[in-house]
Amino acid sequence: MPSAPTELRDCPAPAKLNLFLHVVGRRPDGYHLLQTVFQLIDWCDTLHFGRRADGRLVRTTDIPGVPADEDLVIRAARLLQAETGCAYGADIALEKRLPMGGGIGGGSSDAATALLALNRLWGLDLPRAKLMSLGLRLGADVPFFLFGQNAFAEGIGEALTPIALPPATFVVIHPRVHVPTPEIFSDEGLTRNTPLTIITDFPDQQIVFAYGRNDLQAVAERKYGEIARALAWLRQFSPLARMTGSGACVFAPFDRAEQAQAVADQVPSEWEGRCAAGLTHHPLAMFAV
């Protein structure tokens, strides 16, 4: 077996889109039961890792508003140390591009990339299933980013089934508002009883982009007018525009990259707009088996 590397640079942490998001119930502990399709896209944060012999975990980049001890990346690394007894530490640098509170899984994806990269950097060779169980302790979306491919998700988001999705390029708009997820889920007006979906309702067909809805969207639009305005603007170009996660990002799929780019080029300057291609697999999927 080859020896573990001493550094891993340019490790991507891709964003996700929820192609639909249905709230189908609520557990006794208050967690909401969901059904969704997760789509990976090529809009990414980038992380760099250097192995340390002294066991320390050092975040070498500052993230405004996120102390190192509260950073999911550091928490993920600390959890991996605790679970394995690993004596190594790491210097960790993060190039942050994905907006926080955007509904695209930025923090969860960063944590998953940390688990995948440190699993290799520290020579731990933990299987994917073990990493996913650790990831669930950090957040409900983290297991998906460790799963390695697009998925139909159930439960609180941790019960995952692989799904093949049609190629698409997405226009993603961040209306530059931060949406705290608990604020949306705790709203009395939230729909919590959407009928259950079965995966055969959308076998790898274009229908998946038009299927269902995001049950969180109506609440977010009511609370954040900028989300409603961004959706109205994007619907000029696609009837499939919808919100991802609990917001604030909205998106629409396009068959052709040139078509998507033409729309992205017109996004009003007060918002952040970009094109992002759909991915079939996580870029670091090979880091675990």
UniProtKB/Swiss-Prot annotation:
PANTHER family: 4-DIPHOSPHOCYTIDYL-2-C-METHYL-D-ERYTHRITOL KINASE, CHLOROPLASTIC. SUPFAM superfamilies: GHMP Kinase, C-terminal domain (SSF55060), Ribosomal protein S5 domain 2-like (SSF54211). The gene is ispE. Pathway: Isoprenoid biosynthesis; isopentenyl diphosphate biosynthesis via DXP pathway; isopentenyl diphosphate from 1-deoxy-D-xylulose 5-phosphate: step 3/6. HAMAP family: IspE. Keywords: ATP-binding, Isoprene biosynthesis, Kinase, Nucleotide-binding, Transferase. This is 4-diphosphocytidyl-2-C-methyl-D-erythritol kinase. Belongs to the GHMP kinase family. IspE subfamily. Its EC number is 2.7.1.148. It comes from Ralstonia nicotianae (strain ATCC BAA-1114 / GMI1000) (Ralstonia solanacearum). One of its GO terms (molecular function) is 4-(cytidine 5'-diphospho)-2-C-methyl-D-erythritol kinase activity. The active site is at residues 16, 141. One of its GO terms (biological process) is terpenoid biosynthetic process. It holds the Pfam family GHMP_kinases_N.
